């Protein structure tokens, strides 16, 4: 699932050939009808307005999540993300205080319906990644569940 609609401008013929071969091998080089219309929409005035509104929603979600974590989850820390909708949450102190592993914490979140991601593949030994590109009501519900059933259970 997903839209294929990116493009590139490469002036170096050798690099262009390598890029085209890689695109062909990946299978992600062919546009479909939905991708074409999405790309056209993205460059329209309405697409710009939509992107502006999306940035506002994501910024609000980031503000909410960062403030919530700092005020409610003792032993959990993070930096405010810049230019992304993903949180990178450091749980090392919380895990040590509760004698738990990251795998146990990840499972606790999943068990209460919070979909989050192991941060170890991103060089965070006790980190969790969390996507905030969703409606505010869902972000609030996720943090309510984490507060009630995971971090302050």
Language model feature labels by segment:
Residues 1-153:
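PLP-dependent class I/II
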């Amino acid at each position: 699932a997903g839209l294929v609609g990116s493009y590139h401008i490469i002036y170096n013929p050798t690099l262009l050939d390598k890029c085209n071969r890689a695109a062909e091998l990946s299978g992600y080089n062919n546009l479909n009808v939905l991708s074409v219309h999405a790309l056209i929409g993205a460059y329209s005035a309405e697409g710009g307005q939509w992107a502006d509104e999306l940035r506002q929603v994501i910024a609000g979600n980031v503000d909410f999540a960062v403030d919530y974590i700092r005020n409610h989850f003792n032993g959990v820390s993070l930096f405010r993300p810049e230019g992304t909708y993903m949180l990178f949450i450091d749980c090392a102190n919380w895990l040590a205080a509760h004698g738990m592993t990251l795998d146990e914490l990840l499972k606790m979140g999943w068990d209460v319906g919070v979909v989050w991601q192991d941060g170890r593949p991103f060089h965070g030994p006790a980190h969790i990644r969390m996507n905030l590109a969703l409606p505010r009501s869902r972000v609030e519900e996720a943090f309510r569940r984490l507060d009630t059933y995971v971090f302050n259970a």
